[in-house]
Amino acid sequence: MDVEFTPSDTNKFEANITKQHQVIELNNQEEQQQPEQQEQPEQQEELKDNNEKIKTSEDSTTTTTTTATITTTGENSISITVTEANNNTNQLNKSTSSSSSLNNNKNEDNKSVTASIAPSSPVIESSAIESAIDSPYISSASVFSNATNNNNNTTTTNVVVPPPQLLESSTENITSAAEITPVTTTTTEETINIPKESIEVQKQLAETTTTAAITTTNSTQVTSTTVTNPDKLKCKMHRSNFIMTQIGGKKFTEMTLEQLLDEDDPQTGMGFKNPGPQGFLEYVGDTAPPPTPPPISTSNTTGKNTGKNSTTGKSEGKKATSNSSNVPPSPVLASSASPSPKLKSSSSSIRNSGAISGTSENGGGGNGSGTISKNTAPTTGNSTTTTTTTTSTTTSSSKDRKSVVQKQSTLGRLQKNEEERRKRKEQKRSRAREKPILIAGIEDLPAECLKMVKKSKIPEDKLIQHLNILLPILRFRTGYNLRHVPIVSSNNSTNSLGSSINKNNSNNTTTTTTTTNTNNKSPEVSTNSLDVNIINQNQNQTNSVQNNQINTSSNVITTNVIPTTTASQSSQAPYHPSHNGNEEDDYDDGSRLENAILPKGTVDLIETDRDVKKLYKNLKQIGSGGFGSVFLAKSTVDKCEIAIKKIAHVSAKAQRTNLNEIGFLNFCKHPNIVSYLRSHLVDDTIWIAMEYMQGGTLTEASQGHTFNESCIAYVAKGMLEGLMYLHAHNIVHRDIKSGNIMMTIDGKIKIVDFGLCVDANERKLVHMAGSPFWMSPEMIRGESYGCPTDIWSFAICLLELANGEPPHRKSSLTAMFTTATEGCAGLDKPERWTEHFTHFLNLCLEMDPSKRSTAEQLLKHPWINLSENPETMKKILAQIFIANVMNHLDN
């Protein structure tokens, strides 16, 4: 078998073995070996009997006895002999004995130390050998494995060392492995009864392990040479380097660095329980173990009689687990009850499978599955102390390295969000082209709409009362083509459409009279009615019936269905199966324009002949949204960094929207509006080049900083100056929100994203557009709107700075429904703010748009005079957005 001696072992085993030195003459050495050879046949017979018992007993276990003999010969050599015996019995009997004597003889050339250890591996219990090998005076070591019989293994290691006088003078290396003192003989015995149920569980565990099977051969001899380094045992240095380089000097306790690196104090120190580099890896806890090296098979001597007890395959795994009692799989330090000096042992966590495995799966370190349990029981005697030490190692695979979940890159996350947004839009467009869904009550809503209504927690009585407001909101959010259809029965009583239909059976005929209300403001029913069809479901016959005609047949139910249309519905084109053109624009989420509104820009503003690769260098994506993606680039023309907005330019709708934005950007020239440079058509994408503003959006600022009134007034002043410019030219932005307000580290406030801009002079605006939380009541209700709708949205932005988020942020349906029916509640904590601020907000949040203050009037309000100093605001904004700027530079 191969024996590996390494100083970087993970577990520190305190062996309760007393040591004595006995000087033996070279002439008597051969005489001592002869009795040992005569005892071997007796041991073989005994082992055969034990193997026979194992075959017939389910509770059989394995006992391993290892004898290590260290002999010093001559002036510069040490002979180390390790003998291991595996004995199978019905009970796990462990016996540890160690005896030695020290005779001061004139002949100092011959020294021998003999230790009998059970059960353990030579690697674990031979710290003295390890220390000798690790000595800086040792140049090489040779390991020989000689197989003797089926269950008796002998390992001899020859090491070249300096003279004893020089070896004794090197106390640092010697004491690190063993302190040799004359002590009394110690005998250790223990008997453990393993339950049958425990063996079954351990057998199942062994079958699932991935430990490499140990190669079995009749006789194997392996010779290796190891060259050690004097710095091999300097674990303190390794731990210190790890703390400073790998975890940035971070300490997990209040202890000093010297205390952390201490290996002797049981109260402190990273390496006390487990010395060596692996000790502090276990100490820090969250550090992953080192990579698992390829498993190394070891030679084990087996004969013909061990065919059924082979150490390979399932049988080997089952035998291995029989040695492990019900103990945790992590290493447990076994302390000694003996007051005698301890043998300082640093050993690997070895995974044994019936026989001794020479190499740890963790590569000589890490948290192995080996366990050491201890039971101590004092016995009466002259000078004998009985101690039981059990070394049990289970055959289980090493724990995999913790999977580190890496965050998605900014580019990947933005692309994913953009793809999801595109899919939602396509779904809404598809729903808008479907046949209208007639809604007479809440129960008629599609499942998705019902889910949104339930989540909003709006009282049902309010939903029923304002159903004509609820349906446009649901259509805006989901894309469903919902039509409000109030029901009026023949006796002038209102019935539910759903209940009327449910009353009809297969033999009934329904007569429906439909009227259309052309008045956009009045919900009253028109007296003009239309001819309707009487559909007989059984006979498929169609008859013409005049309005308000009542069929007196007992099998026929006649109902007058009179839908009333609101202003928002009056602008909708009637449904037709072949209408696939621009129907989708009437059931939009706010990202598209009405067909009747002509785009502000023309194709002459788009450059197609210039090579963008030469104009712009080092493009880096820094943002994404429903509008497209934004990139930071170096402009060779402008000699500065610019922002490039990329938008798809394929469909007619996209082309119209892009031309509209380019036209308004090209037209608007104001310090509080983003500066436009130029546009390019690249394949099927429009590139809009604009000034790059170092900073972030108002949304980011409100989430990461608490603004006082003076800072809010500063932002309000900049926004109002930009809005006053737009409104002076009858331009309605329609998408004023915190995400479209840029705040730079230079203290500038600028309005961006002009894709939904429209000229109010062209026609009366009734189309719902924009973002739900910032929409004005008149837009949600489907009434005509104009520049005052931007003032409402502007006030919501100020509330977002004051409250930290817009009103009703958890539900867009609740926000829109409450805004349309009740208005805005205002500040969350009015007592924290001045009366001037509250009055300013009230002027902006008037439900009646005609009473709402204009941007020019608001700029004259006394509250605006509280605006923060520009130099102070620069420092505040630079502090808020410095992380964004650095992130853009690093990407």
From Swiss-Prot:
Compositional bias annotation for Basic and acidic residues: 45-58
Ranges annotated as biased composition (Basic residues): 422-432
Cofactors (names): Mg(2+)
Superkingdom field: Eukaryota
Gene3D superfamilies: Transferase(Phosphotransferase) domain 1 (1.10.510.10)
Sequence ranges assigned to domain Protein kinase in this UniProt record: 616-864
Recorded GO CC terms: cytoplasm
Key words of the record: ATP-binding, Kinase, Magnesium, Metal-binding, Nucleotide-binding, Repeat, Serine/threonine-protein kinase, Transferase
Reactions listed under catalytic activity: L-seryl-[protein] + ATP = O-phospho-L-seryl-[protein] + ADP + H(+); L-threonyl-[protein] + ATP = O-phospho-L-threonyl-[protein] + ADP + H(+)
E.C. no: 2.7.11.1
Stretches with biased composition (Low complexity): 29-41, 61-70, 86-105, 297-314, 322-360, 379-397, 495-522
Chain positions recorded as ATP binding sites: I622, G623, S624, G625, G626, F627, G628, S629, V630, K645
A GO molecular function held by the record: protein serine kinase activity
Positions of region (Disordered): 24-70, 85-121, 264-435, 495-526, 565-588
PANTHER family with a match to the protein in the record: SERINE/THREONINE-PROTEIN KINASE SAMKA-RELATED-RELATED, SERINE_THREONINE-PROTEIN KINASE SAMKA-RELATED
Family: Belongs to the protein kinase superfamily. STE Ser/Thr protein kinase family. STE20 subfamily.
Record protein name field: Probable serine/threonine-protein kinase mkcC
Organism name: Dictyostelium discoideum
Name of the gene this protein is made from: mkcC
